[in-house]
Curated annotation (Swiss-Prot):
InterPro entries for the chain: 3-5_Exoribonuclease, ERI-1_3'hExo-like, Exonuclease_RNaseT/DNA_pol3, RNaseH-like_sf, RNaseH_sf, SAP_dom, SAP_dom_sf
Name by which UniProt lists this protein: 3'-5' exoribonuclease 1
Lineage: Eukaryota, Metazoa, Chordata, Craniata, Vertebrata
Pfam family, one: SAP
Domain named Exonuclease: residues: 126-302
Cofactor(s), by name: Mg(2+)
């Protein structure tokens, strides 16, 4: 769900020689030098840039990467698209996204040449979850949100394909009658939730489905959400209402809004689902506030970010019932194998 209800969420490249950028300095001008940089022999206008040659980045490959980045920074949007097209990369998106995409392509190629045996740091699978919950217009503070749609989209990070999906509606028990606002927003009808199972039964089905995919046993995986509220609020409250302990597999997750903002260097205000799609050159596919459709669109953003060179990592967790950030510098870890949580006493 997004924030209309007043909340935050609502070929083997290593075998190829990477083109090395060349910079030719012209004669010095009065104060500063000017350069003409070339990517694959094609000129782009530019001015002087400075690189560091100390510390861990003293290896020549990092100097090459810095030179390449300087050239890319001075390319026009048309030049960026032409270069991306040449490498058969996605050409949609705003200029800053295109620059980031091209920079990460060159960086990845150069580092692969430097360390041909580099280990893939991604999870095998990412489970995208975007709950829909009961709601009322104005989002009153005392209202208890109950999950009414539990979708899961299984994204294979190696093939970058959606491998499978799960979806079940959930029968609310505290506020069993959906508000007209909720029906209009989510498209979920009273009849659909009346005929659905209660949350504990649906959670059991979700866990059985995840086990059938060998998540946490054969394959490393993690949860990904669009914001913090799905896990820290909706699932947390629902487990309390259903007298269940919070499931261990959902205690840590990737908040894609944080990942997107940090990777593309954009403010929090530009990390809403529809804005992220727009900035990446994509349109929303499906019905907004359908949990399954939202999850599929979030998966599309995750795929584009992985293609652009982002290492999606767990960045949030629930600890002692409190939402906390997780440092991106920590080693990549997967979620534990899913197990049905015990009942609360």
């Amino acid at each position: 769900m997004e924030d209309e209800r007043g909340r935050e969420h609502g070929g083997d490249a290593a075998q190829q020689k990477t083109p090395r950028p060349e910079c030719e300095e012209s004669r010095p001008l009065s104060v500063e030098k000017k350069q003409r940089c070339r990517l694959d022999g094609k000129d782009t206008d530019g001015s002087k840039f400075i690189t560091s040659n100390g510390g861990d980045f003293s290896d020549p490959v990092y100097k090459e990467i810095a030179m390449t980045n300087g050239c890319i920074n001075r390319m026009s949007k048309e030049e960026l698209r032409a270069k991306l097209s040449e490498f058969k990369l996605e050409t949609r998106g705003v200029k800053d996204v295109l620059k980031k995409r091209l920079k990460n392509y060159y960086k990845k190629q150069k580092l692969m040449l430097k360390e041909s045996n580099a280990v893939d740091s991604y999870y095998d699978y990412i489970c995208i979850i975007d709950f829909e919950a009961t709601c009322e217009e104005g989002n009153p503070a005392e209202f208890l949100h109950e999950i009414i749609e539990f979708p899961v989209v299984l994204l294979n990070t190696h093939s970058l394909e959606i491998e499978d999906t799960f979806q079940q509606y959930v029968r609310p028990e505290v506020n069993s009658q959906l508000s007209e606002f909720c029906i209009g927003l989510t498209g979920i009808t009273q009849d659909q939730v009346d005929r659905a199972d209660a949350f504990p039964q649906v959670l059991k089905k979700v866990i059985e489905w995840m086990k059938s995919k060998e998540l946490g046993t054969k394959y490393k995986y993690c949860i990904l959400t669009d914001g913090s509220w799905d896990m820290s609020k909706f699932l947390n409250i629902q487990c309390q209402l259903s007298r269940l302990k919070y499931p261990s597999f959902a205690k840590k997750w990737i908040n894609i809004r944080k990942s997107y903002g940090n990777f593309y260097k954009v403010p929090r205000s530009q990390t809403k689902l529809t804005i992220m799609l727009e900035k990446l050159g994509m349109d929303y596919d499906g019905r907004p506030h359908s949990g399954l459709d939202d999850s599929k669109n979030i998966a599309r953003i995750a795929v584009r970010m992985l293609q652009d060179g982002c290492e999606l990592r767990i960045n949030e967790k629930l600890h002692g019932g409190q939402l906390m950030s997780v440092s991106s510098s920590l080693p990549v870890e997967g979620a534990p194998a899913p197990q049905m949580p015990h009942s609360r006493k």
